[in-house]
């Protein structure tokens, strides 16, 4: 019987339970950060339990980290959460990449970077964008606080198996369009809830030609499509990325042979299929207050269809028939678990090289990990950003969410490489416009969005 990639991995991990009901599945990797872990560790203490597999658990600090001065944590709650993670990981013998550590960074960046993220695994974390790790051909999803405690105690989790959806991506990406534009285009076309109840697999020649960094960007935003899980079949690109990393399997050839068994046998095995052609795709920009409210950079903003649109326009300070190029910007943010990897920074730096920020723009560039930061400094990329007038920061989640000092002021427009543009997401009253690293970098130079596919940029 032919099966999907998701089905094959799921079946390998089921311990007990019937299809259609909650099943107990084994967890291969549990990633932990400072925000969603304090209560679970307290729960373990209250029942005198230990962490079942500390060797399959890894913790880092990211959400609360002040990226301008990582050791100067002013917020009392942030400091408490960070100190508590140090205490808990020490008590329960869990590896921790604390602030200042060479391995520290955003959890969904350092997991793959260290080689912890591998094909055919079940990976969980108390964070919705855990779907990022599915780019390696893994089942990866975010879990709630009580589930974090359950995984710590048992290395298992109860889950109802979702249906499967295949999204076939076809065509050749035009110049200066990227994976961020693909996933934003898919969400703009199909909406923010089409993936509810499904595990999404991205496939097709376009996906096969993407780098691992680009695949991670697409899987990262599966959650913005309503799914908890996005994934890509493992292939030679996957294997090349993992090989030689710190936590890569010692017998790599055997591991690669095992991973190669995991693929979708036939398109007809999916419960649902969609297609998306990128041949004429333009860079995407969000204009509203959810990721589905996005438009190609060269098109006018849409007419108001309902109260949601009207409210979004009022909040964001725009109106129909404007174009993204008419949006004047106050801030740009290059970072987050969506687009803070070396490749993302390199793309943005190439766009900024030899230019300077517009006078009205403040720019924060936040690498996803200490390793990426060090590499960017060594290669000269960091210098390009600094010469352009950007603030070159320490690794952390930063302005993706208003949980640390990196907040966008009320009423200000920010072009952001992050994944969510909800009301107040980047600071109370902030106005977020999502786009690719290349688009955000170019917007910082111009002071507004520009079409980077035109002759001037191509």
From Swiss-Prot:
Q: Which organism is it from?
A: Leuconostoc mesenteroides subsp. mesenteroides (strain ATCC 8293 / DSM 20343 / BCRC 11652 / CCM 1803 / JCM 6124 / NCDO 523 / NBRC 100496 / NCIMB 8023 / NCTC 12954 / NRRL B-1118 / 37Y)
Its BP terms in the Gene Ontology are: L-leucine biosynthetic process
For the keyword Hydrolase, the answer is: no
**Taxonomic lineage per UniProt?**
Bacteria, Bacillati, Bacillota, Bacilli, Lactobacillales
The UniProt similarity line reads:
Belongs to the aconitase/IPM isomerase family. LeuC type 1 subfamily.
Give binding positions for [4Fe-4S] cluster: 337, 397, 400
Molecular function via GO: 3-isopropylmalate dehydratase activity; 4 iron, 4 sulfur cluster binding; metal ion binding
The free-text note explaining how the cofactor binds reads: Binds 1 [4Fe-4S] cluster per subunit.
Task: Supply the name of the protein.
Answer: 3-isopropylmalate dehydratase large subunit
The record's SUPFAM superfamilies line, in alphabetical order, gives: Aconitase iron-sulfur domain
Which purpose does this protein serve, as stated in its record?
Catalyzes the isomerization between 2-isopropylmalate and 3-isopropylmalate, via the formation of 2-isopropylmaleate.
PANTHER family reported for this sequence: 3-ISOPROPYLMALATE DEHYDRATASE, HOMOACONITASE, MITOCHONDRIAL-RELATED
Q: Which cofactor does it need?
A: [4Fe-4S] cluster
Assigned EC number: 4.2.1.33
* Source organism superkingdom: Bacteria
The family database entries (NCBIfam families) matched by this protein are listed as: leuC (TIGR00170), PRK05478.1 (NF004016), PRK12466.1 (NF009116)
Listed pathway(s): Amino-acid biosynthesis; L-leucine biosynthesis; L-leucine from 3-methyl-2-oxobutanoate: step 2/4
Please list the reactions this protein catalyses: (2R,3S)-3-isopropylmalate = (2S)-2-isopropylmalate
Q: Which gene encodes it?
A: leuC
């Amino acid at each position: 019987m032919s099966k999907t990639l998701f089905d094959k991995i799921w079946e390998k991990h089921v311990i007990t339970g019937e299809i259609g009901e909650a099943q107990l599945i084994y967890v291969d990797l549990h990633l932990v950060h400072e925000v969603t872990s304090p209560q679970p560790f307290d729960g373990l203490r209250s029942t005198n339990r230990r962490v079942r597999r500390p060797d399959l658990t890894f913790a880092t600090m990211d959400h609360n980290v002040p990226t301008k001065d990582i050791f100067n944590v002013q917020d009392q709650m942030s400091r408490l959460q960070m100190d508590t993670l140090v205490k808990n990981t020490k008590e329960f013998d869990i590896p921790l990449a604390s602030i200042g550590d060479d391995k520290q960074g955003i959890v969904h960046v350092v997991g793959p970077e260290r080689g912890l993220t591998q094909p055919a695994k079940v990976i969980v974390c108390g964070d919705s964008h855990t779907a990022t790790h599915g780019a390696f051909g893994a089942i990866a999803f975010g879990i709630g606080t009580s589930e974090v405690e359950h995984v710590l105690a048992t290395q298992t989790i109860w889950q109802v198996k979702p249906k499967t959806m295949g999204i076939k991506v076809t065509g050749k990406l035009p110049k200066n369009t990227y994976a961020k534009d693909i996933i934003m285009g898919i969400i703009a076309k199909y909406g923010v809830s089409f993936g509810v109840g499904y595990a999404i697999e991205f496939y097709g020649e376009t996906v096969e030609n993407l780098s691992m960094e680009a695949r991670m960007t697409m899987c990262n935003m599966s959650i913005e499509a309503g799914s908890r899980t996005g994934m890509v079949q493992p292939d030679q690109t996957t294997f090349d990325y993992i090989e030689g990393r710190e936590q890569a399997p010692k017998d790599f050839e055997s591991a690669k042979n095992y991973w190669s068994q995991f693929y979708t046998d036939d398109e007809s095995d999916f419960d649902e299929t969609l297609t998306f052609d990128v041949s004429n795709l333009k860079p995407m920009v969000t204009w509203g207050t959810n990721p589905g409210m996005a438009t190609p950079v060269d098109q006018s903003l849409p007419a108001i269809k309902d109260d949601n649109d009207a409210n979004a326009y009022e909040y964001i300070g725009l109106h129909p028939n404007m174009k993204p190029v008419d949006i004047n910007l106050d801030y740009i943010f290059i970072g987050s678990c969506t687009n803070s990897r070396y490749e993302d920074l390199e793309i943005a730096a190439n766009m900024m090289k030899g230019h300077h920020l517009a006078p009205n723009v403040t720019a924060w560039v936040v690498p996803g990990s200490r390793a990426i930061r060090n590499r960017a400094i060594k290669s000269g990329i960091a210098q390009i950003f600094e010469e352009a007038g950007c603030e070159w920061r320490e690794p952390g989640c930063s302005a993706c969410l208003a949980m640390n000092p990196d907040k966008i002021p009320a009423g200000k427009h920010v072009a952001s490489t992050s994944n969510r543009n909800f009301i107040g997401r980047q600071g109370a009253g902030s106005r977020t416009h999502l786009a690719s690293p290349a688009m955000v970098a170019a917007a910082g130079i111009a002071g507004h969005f520009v079409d980077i596919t035109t002759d001037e940029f191509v």
